């Protein structure tokens, strides 16, 4: 397995926390970090984790940049976010950077993580199930899928995604993001070797109408949350809802304040604040999160999407 991260812009300090957490559970898999802030003050600290730094200039995708230049309104540039104003564009561009990196280095079996995620198991243990598919990611809500934890078998596995972006980007009025992109990819390719990681053990919810080759197919949204539960043992993944509840949302949504255990932000289809949580130390004294869905069974959480960027509070050691 190869692990790839990407951040374009001033490298945030929590990058160190993300990679430190990965190395707590996996000391051998190569980690690649795509960045343009090659003079970052945090580079020296990253060296201890055996990270290969990839300059943005060596993997940037000019065709995507041309698409962005001619369709800026669709990507919603958020001036209020300052240096993060290209958030939505970067959220999609990173898949093009990944594609170029995988081609250049002949990488396969890639775990592509968002930097504001913390993992709580060795991701190489997921590879046997991951590799049964071309792509793996998560359902979060209607019209929104999550790539906090994202797997791709080969560079060619990303081609349907790239085609999807070039096909659909111009159609959007605004707010085109990676979550919408993945929904559209699933909407047109959901029977074509894409797997959704389990984010629940069972859940009752409404139906959603997908179209496959122009033919309507209604799929209950609950199936998208647990259709693959059990393939990773008694564990689930976090698309966003658990991390948002436990460690807060991005301070830009809460007047600059990080609020833990906040049930007000419920962007996810599932309201995870209704469930019970606990942390337990494993045999190596690493703190691991668990969730109880009300049936008395504690389910291990493989990752948390720390939307607030307060990764330090979510570290295992």
Model-derived regions, located:
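GT-A fold catalytic core of metal-dependent nucleotide-sugar glycosyltransferases
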Residues: 90-136
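N-terminal anchoring/stem segment of glycosyltransferases
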Residues: 1-80, 103, 154-160, 278-317
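Conserved catalytic core of nucleotide-sugar-dependent glycosyltransferases
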Residues: 120-184
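Secondary-structure boundary elements
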Residues: 25-28, 100-111, 130-132, 153-158, ...
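Surface-exposed cleft-lining segments at the edges of enzyme active sites
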Residues: 81-87
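Catalytic core and acceptor-binding pocket of nucleotide-sugar-dependent glycosyltransferases
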Residues: 159-317
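Non-transmembrane alpha-helical segments in soluble domains
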Residues: 19, 23, 99, 182-187
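Conserved glycosyltransferase catalytic-site signature
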Residues: 88-95, 175-180
């Amino acid at each position: 397995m190869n692990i790839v991260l990407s951040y374009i812009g001033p490298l945030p300090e929590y990058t160190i926390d993300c990679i430190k957490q990965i190395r707590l559970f996996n000391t051998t898999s190569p980690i690649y970090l795509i960045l343009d802030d090659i003079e970052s003050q945090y580079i020296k600290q990253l060296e201890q984790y055996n990270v290969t730094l990839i300059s943005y200039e060596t993997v940037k995708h000019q065709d995507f940049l041309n698409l962005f230049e001619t369709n800026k309104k669709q990507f919603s540039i958020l001036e209020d976010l300052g240096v993060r104003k290209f958030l939505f564009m970067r959220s999609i561009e990173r898949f093009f950077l990944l594609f170029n990196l995988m081609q250049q280095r002949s990488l396969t079996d890639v775990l592509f993580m968002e930097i504001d995620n913390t993992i709580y198991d060795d991701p190489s243990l997921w590879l046997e199930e991951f590799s049964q598919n071309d792509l793996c990611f998560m359902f979060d809500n209607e019209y929104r899928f999550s790539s906090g934890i994202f797997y791709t078998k080969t560079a060619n596995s990303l081609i349907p995604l790239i085609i999807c972006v070039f096909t659909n980007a111009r159609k959007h009025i605004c707010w085109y993001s990676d979550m919408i992109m993945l929904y559209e990819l699933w909407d047109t390719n959901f029977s074509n070797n894409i797997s959704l990681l389990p984010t629940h053990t069972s859940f009752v919810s409404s139906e959603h109408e997908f179209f496959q080759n122009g033919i309507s197919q209604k799929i209950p949204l609950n199936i998208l949350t647990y259709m693959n539960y059990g393939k990773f043992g008694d564990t689930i993944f976090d698309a966003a809802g658990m991390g948002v509840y436990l460690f807060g949302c991005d301070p830009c949504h809460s007047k600059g304040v990080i609020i833990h255990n906040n049930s007000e932000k419920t962007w996810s289809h599932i309201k995870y604040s209704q469930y019970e949580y606990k942390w337990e130390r494993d045999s190596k004294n690493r703190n691991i999160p668990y969730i109880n869905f009300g049936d008395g069974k504690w389910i291990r959480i493989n990752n948390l999407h720390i939307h607030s960027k307060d990764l330090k509070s979510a570290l295992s050691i």
